[in-house]
Regions:
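Amphipathic, small/basic residue-rich leader segments at the start of a protein or domain
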Residues: 1-126
Length: 126
C-alpha cells in the first residue's frame, strides 16, 4: 500500500459543494467538460497518483534528483524516470491548456486538484 491516498471526497466537496464548479461545467462554459466528466478525471488522476506516482516516492526521497550545472542536466534513478514518463504519457498536464495548444480547457480549480494529487503523491515525479 502506498503512503498516499487521495481524499477525493474532500476535493469533490470543495469543487462541487463549496465552489459552484458543477454549475459552470454543466452550463457548457468549458465545452464538453461537464461535472460528471470532471469527477471521472479526478478519479483517474487519483488512481495515477496513488499507484504510479506514489510507487517511487520513498526511492526518490532517498535518492533525489541531482542537478549537474556544469553539464546542464540532472540525474535521476531509473525507477523515477519510469514514473515521470508514465505520468507524462497520461497527458493530464494538458488539462487547462488552450485547445490550440493541444489541451483541454478546464477551470483552474480542477487543474489545481489534479496537480495537488500528483504532487502530493511524489513531488520528484511532477
Amino acid at each position: 500500500m502506498s503512503h498516499y491516498i487521495a481524499n477525493l471526497r474532500d476535493i469533490e466537496f470543495n469543487l462541487f459543494e463549496v465552489l459552484p464548479l458543477g454549475a459552470a461545467l454543466d452550463a457548457g462554459t468549458y465545452g464538453d467538460l461537464d461535472a460528471d466528466t470532471a469527477r471521472s478525471i479526478l478519479d483517474e488522476v487519483s488512481k495515477l497518483a496513488e499507484d504510479v506516482a506514489a510507487e517511487t516516492f520513498v526511492e526518490a526521497d532517498r535518492n533525489p534528483p541531482v542537478f549537474l550545472p556544469d553539464e546542464h542536466r540532472i540525474t535521476i534513478s531509473d525507477d523515477l524516470a519510469k514514473t515521470v514518463r508514465l505520468v507524462k504519457e497520461a497527458e493530464w498536464w494538458r488539462l487547462g491548456l488552450d485547445e490550440r495548444a493541444g489541451g483541454t480547457p478546464a477551470p483552474a480549480a480542477l487543474v489545481w486538484a489534479t496537480q495537488e494529487m500528483l504532487i502530493s503523491a511524489n513531488p520528484s515525479a511532477t
